[in-house]
Amino acid sequence: MDAAALIDKFLQFGEDRKIEEMQAMMAPQSRIEFPGGKLFSTQTEMVTNAKGRYTWIKKHRDRYFVGVNGDQTTVTSIGTLYGENLAGVPFDGIRYVDVFVIENGLIKEQMVWNDLCESGVLDVK
């Protein structure tokens, strides 16, 4: 499986809330960084932190960029977020960029950037 397909599968597991499958794709002692500098070491920690922010969220995964640097492959996924906030109001079109560093076939780093908070959609009632 090529690197972009690996990340697409990982992101689909996230949308399907198959957290154990996601974690199996992560390297030991991996690093997950979210907006605001929030750091996690497991997908379970990340999902637990996200509870209470929205009812559900998914991604329109528009493009992937792949680069290789020695033993590491970096995959960047660009697209938009859509979902439903806690008040039941749908949202769509929120920009995101996810960067993944893969080493030995496992995700070593996941860095997430998005406009979710800036958009104000989580506060709409």
Regions picked out by a protein language model, each given a short descriptive name:
Residues 80-104:
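Exposed beta-sheet edge and beta->alpha loop/turn motif
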Residues 71-81:
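A short hydrophobic beta-strand element
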